[in-house]
Amino acid sequence: MIRSVSLRGFMNINDGRHAFAPGLNVIVAPNGAGGHNLLKLLCAVEFAGAFTTRWMTKLGYAQSITGRLRENFRPGCVGDLARGECAVELEHEEAQGTLAFGFKTGAEFVSVDAMPSGTAPGRPVFIPMQELSSFVPWFPKLFEMWHVGFEGVWRDTCSVLGAEDTKSEPAAPLAALLDRLEKRLGGRVAEHPDDKSLVVIREGAMVPMSELDSGERRIVMLARFVRNGMISPGMILFWNEPDACMDDELRRLVAASAAAFVEAGVQVFACTHSEALADLMIGRCPPGLAARIRL
């Protein structure tokens, strides 16, 4: 669980410290305030392995974080992300100590000043504003083979969307949520046996993603992540614009999904421009398990 982050000089995000709840954290930010960038920064650090091994050196941290920042933001060099001199400090519940790193404008690599001594299990999942259900399974291969102008988190998301279903049933709150998601879709999300693309099985017939609208495809992503265990207790979910392309019915389903994730022990970071959506999502969570962060 991420406890807090302190930022100075990172892109368009105002300097300051933000403390996070153990459950749902809704980042409410106007256009241009950097909400999406904050999600990608936190996800980059988590993916970098900064809290997954006690044997990593400061140089290893620096190389790993640099690589993830380059993939997530696609800058000319990592120093392009700094306003003069940038400093980031991140506290993690499971790791003892603080991860602190920084870099200056024009720098090729970050410099790690302090790192935690403990470990924190689990890998994050990032759900972007765009639906990616129709990008499986071809996008990760395209990303690796060619220099394409897409964020690295898209590749990561598509990779976990394509992961096989777990043999065990999801935890109780997630099992109930999965049933609700699949009822809304009219069937179970599965892979096409021939090309491994995602389909919805409705009354024995395979419905391709091209026959669903964008909002439904985003629900497909949620159902898939629960079914294959990529959203499970103890992990972290980064969720940009959860209600993008959704009507009021799906927006309520999104709020219910966030509450189920929190109940199952998932830490959720959601970014939105809408105070109304923040109210809806936070209102579904028990007191003390949700927070609103304004940028």
Enumerate the predicted regions with their spans:
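Phosphate-coordinating catalytic segments in nucleotide- and nucleic-acid-processing enzymes
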Residues: 3-4, 45-234, 288
